[in-house]
Amino acid sequence: MVRRTSAGWLFLMLRAYRNWDFPKGVVNPGEEPLAAARREVREETLIDNLQFTWGEEYRETEPYSHNKVARYYLGETRTECVSLPVSPELGRPEHNESRWMDLAGVLAVASPRVAPIVRWAAEKIGIPDKPA
């Protein structure tokens, strides 16, 4: 998820323990993947005004942690303030922190699994790739 500011594009990163990632989650039975992406963003951040300015193209990670594959869409929002609501299943927020970051900041904290997704998103929105 990205947000355009007067200083340029920012990416929303969420931290769970020491790991930074984008909003993500499980596709429920009968749910379309893009609808699941919208729902997960809303559940994890309360942001409900996503626009898919660059279409429904997505990127997936390489398999990780028990062969999971995360699918990421590039959504845009104008929302600056992010809330981390309590998950009914966990009894606490799913994430410890949220932060809007520029490309260099994201690449500095992104795991090797997430970094290719960041670079793809940066290319889609027209940010030149910068080494971390």
Predicted regions and their residues:
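Active-site-adjacent beta-strand/loop module that shapes the phosphate/pyrophosphate-binding cleft
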Residues: 58-86, 99, 121-128
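The catalytic Nudix box helix
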Residues: 22-56
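Short, well-ordered beta-strand micro-motif
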Residues: 1-3, 74-76, 102
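NUDIX/MutT-family hydrolases
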Residues: 84-121
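Hydrophobic pocket-lining residues within nucleotide cofactor-binding pockets
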Residues: 27, 77, 106
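Residues that flank catalytic or metal-binding motifs in active/ligand-binding sites
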Residues: 16-18, 69-71, 94
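Glycine-centered loop/turn positions within well-structured domains
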Residues: 18-20, 43, 80
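N-terminal strand-loop-strand
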Residues: 1-23
